[in-house]
């Protein structure tokens, strides 16, 4: 259940960002939007979202500097990275920096909603497909 959870979408592609906002709001989430990593970083401190959906490649400041900034900060919300980049080393670095999920564009909205649900409700048991 979305309840009163707030999600910050940080993406310079406003068409995608607006689409995510519409879908997430229909699920009951409050959605904030930022156009680049610098604005997104400021909004994390201002609004304290419960989750951030972060694009990797953006003008001014991309996703990696945002991840690096929040890596060891206790106030950091969980972050889902979305990207059109195919490189496995990019995924490995994002995971090293602490993303809860790494989703390649284009993606099925159900895939993102599943990831959002898991990130916001980590106490729910996961399937046994994870590494042991």
Task: Tell where the protein language model's regions lie, with residue ranges.
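Charged docking surfaces used in two-component/phosphorelay signaling
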Residues: 18-26
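Receiver (REC) domain active-site loop signature in two-component systems and cognate sites
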Residues: 58
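Active-site beta3 strand of CheY-like receiver
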Residues: 47-53
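Short amphipathic alpha-helix used as the core "switch/output" element in two-component signaling
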Residues: 42, 64-75
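Acidic catalytic/metal-coordinating carboxylates
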Residues: 35-39, 61-65
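C-terminal output helix
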Residues: 107-116
């Amino acid at each position: 259940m979305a309840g009163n959870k707030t999600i910050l979408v940080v993406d310079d592609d406003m068409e995608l960002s607006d689409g995510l906002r519409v879908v997430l709001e229909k699920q009951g989430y409050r959605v904030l939007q930022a156009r680049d990593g610098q604005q997104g970083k400021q909004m994390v401190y201002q609004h304290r979202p419960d989750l951030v959906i972060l694009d990797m490649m953006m003008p001014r400041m991309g996703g990696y500097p945002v991840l690096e900034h929040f890596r060891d900060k206790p106030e950091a919300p969980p972050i889902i990275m979305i990207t059109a980049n195919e490189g496995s080393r990019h995924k490995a670095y994002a995971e090293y920096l602490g993303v809860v999920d790494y989703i390649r564009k284009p993606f099925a909205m159900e895939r993102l909603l599943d990831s959002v649900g898991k990130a916001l409700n980590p106490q729910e048991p996961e399937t046994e497909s994870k590494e042991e």
